[in-house]
Design a protein with these regions (language model features):
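Canonical tetratricopeptide repeat
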Residues: 101, 146-147, 153, 187, ...
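Structural signature of tandem alpha-helical TPR/SEL1-like repeats
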Residues: 77-83, 111-132, 160-173, 194-207, ...
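Terminal, low-structured helical/coil segments at or just beyond the last alpha-helical repeat
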Residues: 228-272
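Structural marker of alpha-solenoid helical repeat scaffolds
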Residues: 91, 137, 141-143, 177, ...
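Alpha-helical segment of the N-proximal tetratricopeptide repeat
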Residues: 64-91, 108-117, 156-157
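Helix-start (N-cap) detector for alpha-helical repeat units in TPR-like alpha-solenoids
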Residues: 65, 96-97, 141-143, 148, ...
């Protein structure tokens, strides 16, 4: 193909640029360099745009997964909540909201199985793991009460599997996280009493009923310690105190009557 004699094509930066023989070589160099830079920045700019679009797509996908996880959690679809929060964490392991949602979903599943009296050890272990990771991300007090309760449930599940399981460390950590978690105090006192540390158990039960006068189990368990030691008067004192604080509690009502009947029998027999 013939080209005009005063107009040829020069290949620069993979683009065909026109040259003009009557222009000096210096001017031509400047022109071609400038045009090359324009082409370079156009290509580079397109790469930046593509990268930005990719980041936006990933961010949008994460947001969608997060939204779906929140919605699933709200309606009680915990398996789907776990799946969506896990997708977010695959791309962003330190995402606080996704980690919190995942921990809550595992907690809810484990709690549901507790009500059905099913084995929950593996679920509480996983829940505790998620809360532990969460505390490394979020140092606020928002997560500590649930983490504390999780450790209580984990200790109880371990004891259900093996009555000799070492759970004191878990209970102490639970109490440290939430000093108002009287369930952990109560379980710790039960273990101490079973190990023969009756005085230690009594102190914990007394602490519980002083701080939380409507904690029925502490009254029942403290009364049992006195009853087993044949101190029926003290047992009646504790149970009746609990019955007064919680008149609708059937267990306290029952043992208060039992203690009263025993004391009356002892009076009639001259043993008291």
């Amino acid at each position: 193909m013939l080209m005009p004699p005063d107009h040829c094509l020069l290949a620069t930066n993979h683009c065909l640029l026109p040259t003009f023989p009557h222009l000096s070589s210096q001017i031509l160099y400047i022109l071609t360099t400038m045009l090359g830079r324009v082409v370079f920045y156009r290509v580079f700019g397109r790469l930046e745009i593509l990268f930005a679009m990719l980041v936006a797509a990933v961010f949008c996908a994460c947001n969608n997964d997060m939204s779906r996880g929140d919605e699933a959690l709200r309606i009680g679809d915990y398996d789907r909540a776990i799946a969506n929060f896990s997708k977010v964490l695959d791309g962003e392991p330190a995402n606080r909201d996704a980690r919190y949602g995942l921990a809550i979903a595992y907690y809810a599943i484990a709690e549901d199985k507790e009500r059905l009296k099913e084995n929950t050890l593996a679920l509480w272990e996983r829940t505790a793991r998620e809360f532990k990771i969460l505390t490394a991300i979020d140092s606020s007090d928002k997560v500590t009460p649930l983490y504390s309760t999780t450790l209580f449930y984990l200790a109880r599940a371990m004891l259900a599997e093996n009555e000799h399981a070492r759970v004191m460390r878990l209970l102490d950590e639970s109490i440290q996280l939430d000093p108002s978690n009287y369930f952990s105090y109560n379980l710790k006192a039960l273990i101490l009493g079973g190990q023969g540390d009756v005085d230690g158990a009594k102190k914990i039960y007394a602490y519980i009923v002083t701080r939380e006068p409507k904690f029925a189990s502490a009254y029942v368990n403290l009364g049992n310690l006195y009853w087993n030691a044949h101190d029926y008067e003290s047992a009646w004192d504790i149970w009746s105190m609990g019955h007064e604080a919680l008149p609708q509690d059937p267990v306290l009502a029952k043992w208060t009557r039992v203690a009263e009947d025993s004391l009356k029998a002892m009076v009639y027999s001259g043993k008291l």
